[in-house]
Amino acid sequence: LKKLKDEGLLSGFEVRNLVVPNPVLPSFYCMPKTHKEGNKVRPVVANVNTPISKICDYLVKKFRTLKRPYSMSVKNSFETAERLAKETLTNEEVVVSFDVEALYPSVPVEEAYVLFSEWIDEQDISDVDAKLLVRLMRIVLDQRWLDYDGKVYRQKEGLFIGNAVSPILAEIFMGNIESKIKTSDWLPR
């Protein structure tokens, strides 16, 4: 953050607001998937009071002001229902939905970062703001350390479930795949 301040991308006030006093390592825990058969769990990395938690909050706040990455993405089930209500299907058509198993841990971090950078470049924001968002995302993605049972580990691949920026990165990554499918001859419309 000091380097971003020295480059004029952040003010001293902004740096102070992005620094977490007395931060802790993100901690790993599992949430049971009660809706699934067997003993399946969802691995979560708690990002509360960590070195990057305020940066993540800052980024998420900024993302809300930007255009959504892909027209096919939806905010919630209400928006899905609203969109489907506007569609008319023929008797030969069906609606399909896909669920990705372990989406966040399966997203390739560097590819998601490149796609994120491209998405930011398409936004109607200043070059300084764009550069800042991309650099802050790099800081977040480089922080891949976590605590589990008193030992420190580094997650090599995928996004953390529990990190506030993971949803937008996953949306950008999946949207890129959907966009490629939509522009191919794989789908009728």
What are these regions (language model features)?
Residues 73-74, 79-82, 86-189:
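Conserved polymerase palm-domain catalytic core
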Residues 2-14, 60-69, 116-129, 164-165:
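Short charge-dense sequence patches
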Residues 25-71, 101-105, 154-183:
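Conserved pre-motif C helix in the palm subdomain of viral-like polymerases
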Residues 14, 21-28, 32, 94, ...:
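Hydrophobic, conserved cores of late-appearing folded domains
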Residues 3-5, 32-37, 55-57, 89-93, ...:
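Short amphipathic alpha-helical segments, especially helix-boundary/capping motifs
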Residues 1-28, 37:
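Non-catalytic, polymerase-adjacent accessory regions of viral genome-replication enzymes
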